[in-house]
A protein has these predicted regions:
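Mid-to-C-terminal secondary-structure elements
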Residues: 115-127, 139-263, 475-655
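Hydrophobic alpha-helical bundles that form the membrane domains of multi-pass transporters
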Residues: 260-341, 345-346, 360
Length: 789
């Protein structure tokens, strides 16, 4: 207790250093804790799964196109997993753009079709009702979706009309798991509701202990035919992928972005690096300022050692002081985190709730950080001769060198973060300003066709009615004066496409992406035809012609389309006599996704019309409101509801760069905080160093030194440290930038102005911190100083 009181009294006597140290460490801890919470949340995705490392999905690979699927839906050359090894098996079908009807309102819904076994593998909290799908009509709603439809009413037992025309009954309300989840939905439907859904299911397996997963994957690596090879020579392979790994493989789920979340390991590594650098900056700053404070007690420690104080007592004294500081900084950091919770959640696009991890993290910081920060001061004073401690307070050259070393290390990190911040903001600016190669203004992506996803619900009459509605829809769109062009499809221009192998006239195999289109597609997006001509194909014309982009033409080994053609490899395998189909036109390249992914060689099978619920609509500039009102009235006329989903292409493109924007913002914010922490460290050190040199300054003034000479003298040491730190940081920053962006098709140049701006920015802010103290020191009264020193 006596040691505790003594430590507290020392901290209170050194209020300036204590406050500066406390603020620097609190800022560092707050930023590091925020980042560690986010990183932990990313690393614990899907922990609501009973065993996410040993629950597996089937990942199929068909001619280079990977996706989650099942084995039971392949009817030719089939293979199945031996049920003797299976502990539990379930399936699910994601229906991203589905809907339900409540009263007269059509409400968009992300539906997940599954069975009760799903809840044996994934644990969801039950808010109301029961967590089961006992009947075909059973449905479970998320708490948020139930509130959206029913408000504060009790939803249990309520009836909703599903898109297939069947009624479903709300049996239960599920809450959100504490962890982040890959699959996100609004409604869970029973797989018994229909036998013929719009898309194939995905199978999930939990195997018995001892099952050889590698043996199953080896069996799955053997190519097998999808259909009878006489007509279809495509093959597929399969492998097992754990639930834990699905999140990190976005290519498996990128066609349903509203239902599936995916992670980016590179992004997480960046955040981990920023977290480590900020924490290191705070720790170095803490140790450095604490050493400065201890220099004032060098004589005291020397006398204590003369009178027999042992090393344990000295360490206990230093450790308690550091623990008090760390505890105070930790409390302040959590206060900062709480105050900044709303901006933080907006920045990271996730909700942070308090979990056991927060407690363990705080306890670890409180236990480990005081020990880490006490080691060097303890070694320094325990093994320093008492005579040296008594003779001098901070006059030893090695003390100054260590202070400058720690300060320099802080500034290396600061320069590194500032350079990275400037670069990634420039990279973001380039991504947002680079034209994708197609028209983006005044284009909407609109879901206009709201028909059943349940194929078993269709009869001849209902199919005819559907055709009539779609024909009426097209006629109304053609008659609208505000709509220039439209294109019905299942995806928009940004949606990831699949591909397959094509053969050129030499029989060489080339993988090309496939994008089905009509002649209107190229006009709608202002995609320039650079060779040949895309023919006008009317509705009665059932032919399909091939158009390629420049990248595909180059990949095929052609320089012109004159006399050349392509054929799908599978078609050639099925019919050796099949001839190449001519390429009628070449269009300009464009980026159909994130710019860093580059331009993909693409072939366009162009026909009269392709069906789809998604309409890509180009409208007259300045007529946005009129078009939306027109579409709302059209939906009401066709389906009896004014509700429909739409986005604008410009917004969709901006959304692609959300993570890039987040990275740039994080670097900017935390680089600014690193500057603040380093400036606080510089302030604390300069408070001591300049005060120690008052007698020297007084003597120099007596001998005729001008204020300009004193400014140069006092600034020189700190500028030297900053320049050395900058020189060391340049190659580190250059290496990190090049390593991270080496696979980017589009990246900003690493120009010298980034480094110059970072140098000027840090120097101006840092030396501005010193200005008042140096001005004060340069204008001291030599007589007064000589009397008191």
């Amino acid at each position: 207790m006596k040691t505790l009181k003594y430590s507290w009294r020392f901290l209170m006597r050194s209020k300036s250093y204590t406050i500066i140290n406390l603020l620097g460490l609190a800022c560092s801890l707050a930023c590091s804790i925020i980042l560690m919470r986010y990183i932990h949340r990313e690393l614990t995705v899907d922990t609501h799964c009973i065993d996410r490392e040993h629950v597996y999905a089937i990942c199929t690979n068909t001619e280079g196109n990977r996706g989650l699927s099942g084995l039971k839906q392949y009817n030719y050359d089939t293979i199945s997993i031996d049920n003797r090894f299976v502990e539990a098996m379930t399936t699910y079908i994601p229906l991203e753009k589905d809907y339900v009807i409540s009263g007269t309102n059509r409400i968009p819904a992300r539906c997940l079709v599954t069975d009760s076994v799903f809840f044996q593998l994934f644990h969801y909290p039950i808010v109301q009702g029961k967590l089961s799908l006992t009947t075909p009509q059973s449905a479970l709603l998320t708490e948020k979706y139930a509130r959206k439809i029913f408000g504060n009413e009790n939803p249990i037992g309520k009836i909703l009309r599903y898109s297939n025309g069947k009624d479903i009954t709300v049996e239960g309300i599920v809450g959100e798991p504490e962890c982040k989840t890959t699959i996100n939905f609004d409604i869970i439907l029973s797989s018994k509701l229909s036998q013929h859904w719009e898309r194939m299911n995905t199978e999930l397996y939990r195997f018995l202990p001892g099952t050889d997963i590698n043996a199953i994957n080896k069996t799955g690596s053997v190519p097998r035919y999808i259909n009878d090879p006489e007509y279809d020579t495509r093959t597929h392979t399969f492998s097992l992928i754990s639930v834990k790994d699905i999140y990190w493989d976005g290519s498996l789920t990128d066609r349903e972005p509203a239902m599936f979340l995916s992670g980016n390991r590179s992004h997480l590594i960046i955040l981990s690096g920023v977290c480590l650098l900020l924490l290191l900056t705070g720790i170095l700053n803490f140790i450095n300022l604490y050493l400065v404070a201890l220099l004032r007690r060098g004589k005291e420690y020397g006398l204590k050692k003369v009178f027999g104080v042992c090393g344990k007592t000295l360490f206990a004294n230093i450790w308690i002081e550091n623990t008090l500081l760390v505890l105070s900084a930790l409390l302040v950091s959590w206060l900062i985190i709480e105050i900044m919770s709303a901006p933080t959640e907006y920045l990271f696009d996730t909700h942070f709730s308090y979990t056991a991890f927060d407690g363990w993290l705080s306890a670890s910081i409180l236990l480990l950080l005081p020990v880490i920060t006490s080691i060097y001061p303890y070694i320094k004073y325990n093994y320093t001769s008492p005579i040296l401690s008594i003779r001098s307070i901070g006059a030893q050259s090695h003390s100054k060198h260590f202070r400058m070393f720690f300060l320099g290390a802080q500034y290396i990190i600061t320069f590194l973060l500032v350079v990275l911040s400037l670069y990634f903001n420039r990279q973001l600016g380039m991504l947002l300003s680079t034209k994708p190669g197609f028209r983006t203004k005044n284009i909407m992506n609109v879901n206009l066709v709201y028909e059943s996803k349940d194929f078993s619900s269709y009869t001849y009459e209902s199919m005819q009615q559907r055709r009539q509605r779609v024909m009426q829809l097209d006629n109304e769109l053609n008659a609208c004066p505000f709509i220039e062009l439209y294109e019905p499809s299942y995806e928009n221009i940004l949606t990831p496409t699949f591909g397959t192998n094509y053969l050129n006239n030499k029989g060489e195999k080339v993988f090309l992406n496939i994008h089905y289109a009509t002649p209107a597609f190229f006009k709608l997006y202002d995609i320039k035809v650079i060779e040949g001509e895309i023919p006008d194909i009317n509705k009665e014309d059932r032919r399909t012609v091939f158009v390629v982009n420049k990248a595909a033409l180059k990949a095929l080994g052609y320089t012109s389309i004159n006399g050349v053609g392509v054929i799908e490899e599978n078609q050639k395998k099925a019919n050796a006599n099949a001839s190449l189909q001519p390429i009628v036109a070449v269009v300009e390249d464009y980026f159909e996704g994130h710019l860093t992914s580059g331009i993909k060689p693409t072939i366009y099978p162009v026909g009269a019309r392709f069906s789809g619920d998604l309409y890509q609509i180009a409208y007259t500039p300045g007529k946005k409101k009129e078009v939306i009102d027109f579409l709302r009235n059209l939906e009401y006329k066709l389906y009896g509801s004014e509700d429909f989903e739409y986005t604008f292409l410009e917004d969709d493109i901006k959304a692609m760069y959300t993570q890039d924007r987040q990275t740039a913002t994080i670097y900017s914010i935390f680089a600014s905080i690193a500057i603040i922490i380093s400036s606080l460290g510089l302030l604390g050190i300069s408070l001591f160093d300049i005060r120690q040199r008052y007698r020297e300054i007084a003597i120099r003034k007596v001998n005729g030194a001008s204020a300009k000479d004193l400014y140069r003298l006092l600034f020189r040491k700190y500028i030297t440290v900053l320049i050395i730190a900058f020189v060391i940081a340049i190659p580190l920053a250059y290496y990190l930038i090049n390593t991270y962006t080496q696979d980017f098709a589009v990246r900003a140049p690493v120009s010298i102005d980034i480094f110059i701006i970072s140098l000027l920015l840090v120097i101006i802010i840092s030396l501005g911190t010193l200005a008042y103290q140096i001005q004060k020191a340069a204008h001291i009264n030599p007589t007064q100083i000589m009397k008191t020193e």
